[in-house]
Amino acid sequence: MVYSYTEKKRIRKDFGKRPQVLDVPYLLSIQLDSFQKFIEQDPEGQYGLEAAFRSVFPIQSYSGNSELQYVSYRLGEPVFDVKECQIRGVTYSAPLRVKLRLVIYEREAPEGTVKDIKEQEVYMGEIPLMTDNGTFVINGTERVIVSQLHRSPGVFFDSDKGKTHSSGKVLYNARIIPYRGSWLDFEFDPKDNLFVRIDRRRKLPATIILRALNYTTEQILDLFFEKVVFEIRDNKLQMELIPERLRGETASFDIEANGKVYVEKGRRITARHIRQLEKDDIKHIEVPVEYIAGKVAAKDYIDEATGELICPANMELSLDLLAKLSQSGHKRIETLFTNDLDHGPYISETVRVDPTNDRLSALVEIYRMMRPGEPPTREAAESLFENLFFSEDRYDLSAVGRMKFNRSLLRDEIEGSGILSKDDIIEVMKKLIDIRNGKGEVDDIDHLGNRRIRSVGEMAENQFRVGLVRVERAVKERLSLGDLDTLMPQDMINAKPISAAVKEFFGSSQLSQFMDQNNPLSEITHKRRISALGPGGLTRERAGFEVRDVHPTHYGRVCPIETPEGPNIGLINSLSVYAQTNEYGFLETPYRKVTDGVVTDEIHYLSAIEEGNYVIAQANSNLDENGHFVEDLVTCRSKGESSLFSRDQVDYMDVSTQQVVSVGASLIPFLEHDDANRALMGANMQRQAVPTLRADKPLVGTGMERAVAVDSGVTAVAKRGGTVQYVDASRIVIKVNEDEMYPGEAGIDIYNLTKYTRSNQNTCINQMPCVSLGEPIERGDVLADGPSTDLGELALGQNMRVAFMPWNGYNFEDSILVSERVVQEDRFTTIHIQELACVSRDTKLGPEEITADIPNVGEAALSKLDESGIVYIGAEVTGGDILVGKVTPKGETQLTPEEKLLRAIFGEKASDVKDSSLRVPNGVSGTVIDVQVFTRDGVEKDKRALEIEEMQLKQAKKDLSEELQILEAGLFSRIYAVLVSGGVEAEKLDKLPRDRWLELGLTDEEKQNQLEQLAEQYDELKHEFEKKLEAKRRKITQGDDLAPGVLKIVKVYLAVKRRIQPGDKMAGRHGNKGVISKINPIEDMPHDANGTPVDIVLNPLGVPSRMNIGQILETHLGMAAKGIGDKINAMLKQQQEVAKLREFIQRAYDLGADVRQKVDLNTFSDEEVLRLAENLRKGMPIATPVFDGAKEAEIKELLQLGDLPTSGQITLFDGRTGEQFERPVTVGYMYMLKLNHLVDDKMHARSTGSYSLVTQQPLGGKAQFGGQRFGEMEVWALEAYGAAYTLQEMLTVKSDDVNGRTKMYKNIVDGNHQMEPGMPESFNVLLKEIRSLGINIELEDE
């Protein structure tokens, strides 16, 4: 395997055995590709903005005299970049400009004669843009649009599984779901009549819709029934015989022909009888006349002589009718073929209950159902029905819907019209009747072939179309109204409705969510989330068990493990590692093709529908070196079932063992040894880990850590290879390799790093360079680590030395005992950044003012403010301190004579303002790290704002001039090379100042051209620099666009350092969570024979009942990894020669049975080996991929190599007594996370505070400064003790007895500790509620 320069710094030993056929794809592609499709110009007009415009335009006027046509669109450049948008609190978006053409036709002239054409570009609002990491910045906060899993458009056949009717009869139904438009349902009722519903309204007999489509009764029966023909010959009744139709019936008469009796009366007709009839080629048999009674006529029979209708279609025949027909000369009678087995008389019965008999009455009936209470007219009824399913504006199946519709009806072509046709409706009814007759199956709604993904692009396009449709109405009005000669397209279009629709979607849609930014993994998981909730989806309350359950088609598409616990379980899922969506939006997963029993490396992506037809082998099937299966019988999946197949039946094989799980679950080592419920908790808790101050890579990982860290976008990744030319804390400069440069550029890449910024979850985002000067780098190398990454690998927690043993009850019920050393070494110290904002508004009584001159506040409180009244950077503040001084004018109050006198003497004005300063919230203390002041245009900036502005200008100028210097240096080095190669002596050049080099001329024409090109570039560079500087200056000095009525906003950022303490929640990666119970002194912790104490003591009883054995294996493997690190450390300390070091590390990498990773340290230079050893001295990182991890024997080998006991247990000694514990204890290294459930955020105490308005009880919760509820169970406890007075106090004065609590307060102040309980307010509420029901209750005083 070839390692790039940075990967060589620390190589993870991989225990994976299966070859990696397919690299992990880019993890954010589902978001980025979808949005790209939305905004890029699509010449076909299938997707995105183009499709939306084409579906609405051209807009014609009602008269048809003019139309507004769409030509093209373009997106402008965003005004601010992403970072500026976040600071200013605005949306990162680009203006959309659309070229429209207004065409006016001649009125009197023949059709299509153009009178005038006007073309113009029109502004149509702003379109939010996606950042490179798949997020949107809306009003300054990062948001993610979650993809939705919804029912695919098409037709679905389903049944109620016998739950609707009391008899338990199964009722079948069919539903046609369009992408947009009305739903059409067909359903059977318990009497086996077929009904139709439109948009889930009142049901009508299904034949109404056929009559509305202009079918007569005769045609309807013709469509759905086969015919039985009777002929009257010589006063005898003969029936045309199709033997197959008799199967299973009991003969009601002797069936005979040509004198031979085939079936005797009363006998059951069997397959043998039918074969005989067919063999003898019997076409007619004679039947008794009574046999025809009860049969149903298939068409109208008219007396040709009189024109009288003797027997209408669908009428039951009787012997009298038969006589009439015979008399009127009808010798051939067609009846409907029905039986109880597989040809039910459903449509015939439905025609009988159908109240309508022609097209008009059917249309009226439909109109009445859709618009109850409106008088129907013929035109209204016709246009309503036409618009329901047959109008392209109102109804669209979409390409997906048409494909699913045609597949369901077994048609060959998969493309077609987006509206329904007569055939579509009839075929759906036919298939539904077939299913009722026992032919065909109902669909599985939860099959992933029937559910599709709607991603960002598609949802944004739909919203945009909604906005356009709103505009369309207005445009039609305008085209009809006015004087078209003076109008331009710009006057027609109002961009407000469009931008409102888009803004509403991105700002407040259920699927537009505040990004979970705890750590890189939570970001990636959030972007790969798939929700069944949201508009057009399910609701939590209505979703049953089936929808939430794992389905066989989830394999490789949706993760069976990662889903939230609680009411959303199973409704919110996560995309599997390799899954992607196809052109129709269905999820597909990759497989390796198997041809003639050989597994090839050819990859095919299959959707859930296609997968059903194949036999697919598991990824862990054993192959020989030629790719043949080793075993004769292979475990495979086929049609959703798992079973054994012979090896020549296999069509495909899984790509990877981690194909099944999501990114979060693929980061859990030894996942295969954990119970699924605990794995779910483990995957969910990794997303809640807070980035620690010093990231520490996991010793035991799965090999996915690098992919997650790089794809999440929190690290700085090299766009092109080169060498590091300059590096400091805030920027890295790379001199690009010659072969990767574009012609005529300076060849310098500059990466500016993010420093101490606040994330959405108030954690700290900070990037730190991990390359040093002069290092060669390649494209894709990690240059700087972000939060929770270590040398380009995800590092959510810390490796802790853990022991599984009880310790004085301090780890009872999942508590965790932690050593003081963990706190001293700042292992779990985290930085949290809080943003506090102070807004100064214009009020009715005058403007609020930000000032240090605050009434009734002592000097001490103002000590941290500058003269503008804003706290200075670096101040240490605690709860209650003033950050920004602000005064608000208050209304003039009636002054007392004394105050008037004081006013007159001192000219005092202090009393007409009140203090409304921004203070630090209670319980928060930290350091001010940044202050930003935003001032409205036209309001004078205060001193602090000007200082900040000046600082920003200086910084911008410094940054840009440094950038210019670096680029200039790059350019001049190339000019130097050209001049020297063109014959100028190097010594002379060195003496000449750089600026004058360009004045030199060369004789070689080609070199001279190169020189001139470079000179041009130099000028362009300086010009560009001036332009950039000017733009920056403008942005910094211009006023800010603030909300109406706001004059100034001051934002103060506080950094809070949180050490770990009792009450904080910690967890491993296997769902093993707990709360810290005690921080123990180092000297009291259990230690081994060398005196090394453990960091954490966990309860061994937490393992067996929860069945997450993965944590034990991780502990053992972590111990081995650390043991090898210790040996390398010892060798480095003894300064042994590199050869020995190389040999030992090579042994460690080679260990393990047939592992896929091949590391050859002989190709490494001595320097590289030393650097590798330096990075391995704290432990050798190990990857044990999911379902393909290290085996027990390999862990033992590794322990042996590290000179450790293979049992994984060692003798420990009690730190307090020095005595040995009675048995060996499992000790090792486990990766522990600190979760974002910190005791500091939860601890809270209340004295007298706010009360609820209605019940007068104290509020609840920390945010409301609320109390703890003394609930039902606590009342029972006091009742059980008979503590009557305590109970009375709890229910009255301590809670909601208003008079009682004020009296109590007074009494306490007076030193008299008496209480006089009265009536609790909640009792009054109860009385009022009963009275509101009309029952009067009066309380009588005894």
Swiss-Prot record:
A GO cellular component entry from the record: DNA-directed RNA polymerase complex
Entry keywords, A to Z: DNA-directed RNA polymerase, Nucleotidyltransferase, Transcription, Transferase
Catalytic activity, EC: 2.7.7.6
Family according to the record: Belongs to the RNA polymerase beta chain family.
Species this chain originates from: Klebsiella pneumoniae subsp. pneumoniae (strain ATCC 700721 / MGH 78578)
Catalyses which reaction(s): RNA(n) + a ribonucleoside 5'-triphosphate = RNA(n+1) + diphosphate
GO annotation, biological process: DNA-templated transcription
Species lineage: Bacteria, Pseudomonadati, Pseudomonadota, Gammaproteobacteria, Enterobacterales
Protein name: DNA-directed RNA polymerase subunit beta
Keyword Nucleotidyltransferase: yes
